[in-house]
Every structure is written in C-alpha cells, then in structure tokens.
C-alpha cells in the first residue's frame, strides 16, 4: 500500500477492525519510511446490478435514486431520514443477497411500496401515484380503497 504522504510502498498494520456494518475492514497503517499513519479500508467488491428501465434502457443501480424518491414521498410526514436510509439499505441488501445482476425497475418500485405501506400510508400513496403514474383522481380513490381493504383484512386475520 503506497503511503499517501511520501509514496513509499511498504507499511505495517498498526490496528485492524471491522466497520460497524461489517462490510469492510478498517486498517490503521504506519509508513516504514516516514512513520506517518493513515487509514485504509478493505471491502468486498460489489457485483454491479443493472436496472432495466420501462423504456428497456439499462443503467447501474443507484441507491440515491431510491433515497430521493423516498424523501419526496415522505416529505412533511413523521418518517425520519434513518428510516428512509434503512429502507434503501434493505432493498439494496435484498438485491445483493438474491445475487441479482439485472432487475426491472418495476421490481424495485414494488419493494419500495411494500416497505412504505408498512410504515406510512400517506407516503405510500404519494409514491404509488408517481410510480404507477396515476392519471386522475379515480386512480387515487381506487388505490386508497385497496389500501383500506388490505388494512381491514389484516385486522380480521389478527
């Protein structure tokens, strides 16, 4: 590992520990020439996931797009940024665990709606209206009716 201060290529590891999310190893190194310390991270290389858009174009999965969509849907709702990040992390983790290399954008949208339905119905309807491209008020009413019906069925099962 090349020292960022003097460029010398030999160092010793002074400390090594796992990051909080256990996805990387943080190493404190000391240059054997200038004796300065620096930090490096070692992590597993992610397999890039391609998202197949509605128009059949493909682009690399970008978690920030999920976060941005959730932030808009949850605006002025009692949903914390931690919850939003958690939803995005769960979706990314699911795709990585399923070892998907290509995924339709519809699949990601459905996962997001599933999570939103569990935490906030208003945010769910907001997201669904954009994702499913609601054309008029009747589409909103239909979605809300379905949501209320699902909620009623859930109470009966309990």
Swiss-Prot record:
Protein's UniProt name: Transcriptional repressor NrdR
Classification of source organism: Bacteria, Bacillati, Bacillota, Clostridia, Eubacteriales
InterPro entries: ATP-cone_dom, NrdR-like_N, RNR_NrdR-like
Organism whose genome encodes this protein: Clostridium novyi (strain NT)
Stated role: Negatively regulates transcription of bacterial ribonucleotide reductase nrd genes and operons by binding to NrdR-boxes.
Gene symbol of the encoding locus: nrdR
GO molecular function: ATP binding; DNA binding; zinc ion binding
UniProt-listed PANTHER family: TRANSCRIPTIONAL REPRESSOR NRDR (PTHR30455:SF2)
Entry cofactors: Zn(2+)
One GO biological process term: negative regulation of DNA-templated transcription
């Amino acid at each position: 590992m090349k020292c960022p201060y003097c460029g010398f290529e030999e160092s010793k590891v002074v400390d090594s520990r796992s990051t909080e999310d256990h996805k990387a190893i943080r190493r404190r190194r000391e240059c054997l020439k200038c004796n300065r310390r620096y930090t490096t991270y070692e992590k597993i290389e992610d397999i890039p996931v391609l998202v197949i858009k509605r128009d059949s174009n493909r682009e690399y999965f970008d978690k920030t797009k999920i976060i941005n969509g959730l932030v808009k849907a949850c605006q002025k709702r009692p949903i914390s940024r931690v919850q939003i990040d958690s939803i995005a992390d769960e979706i990314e983790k699911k795709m990585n665990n399923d070892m998907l290399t290509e995924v339709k954008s519809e699949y990601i949208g459905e996962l997001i709606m599933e999570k939103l339905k569990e935490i906030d119905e208003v945010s769910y309807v907001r997201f669904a209206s954009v994702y499913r491209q609601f054309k008029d008020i009747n589409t909103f009413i239909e979605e809300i009716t379905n949501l209320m019906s699902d909620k009623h069925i859930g109470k009966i099962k309990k």
